UniProtKB/Swiss-Prot annotation:
One of its GO terms (biological process) is defense response to bacterium. This is Aurein-5.2. Residues 26-46 are annotated as: Disordered. One of its GO terms (cellular component) is extracellular region. Belongs to the frog skin active peptide (FSAP) family. Aurein subfamily.
Length: 71
């Protein structure tokens, strides 16, 4: 009977350890996916801000450019 108890405890312990490892790997994968999504969103924002900056810069240059009188 004691042998069966020890075997059962061993099986339960190994099952819990493997379950814990699987959950940890799953969390790591989810964190990697979130990081990739955040990185992609950050790149989109940088691209948008860059294009807006270029457009506004060109507009400001055109507005501040001295106008020559037409002859």
């Amino acid at each position: 009977m004691a042998f069966l108890k020890k075997s059962l405890f061993l099986v339960l312990f190994l099952g819990l350890v493997s379950l814990s490892i699987c959950e940890q790997e799953k969390r790591e994968e989810e964190n990697q996916e979130e990081d990739e999504e955040n990185e992609a969103a950050s790149e989109e924002k940088r691209g948008l801000m860059s294009s807006i900056g270029k457009a506004l810069g060109g507009l400001i240059v055109d507005v501040l450019k001295p106008k020559t009188p037409a002859s």
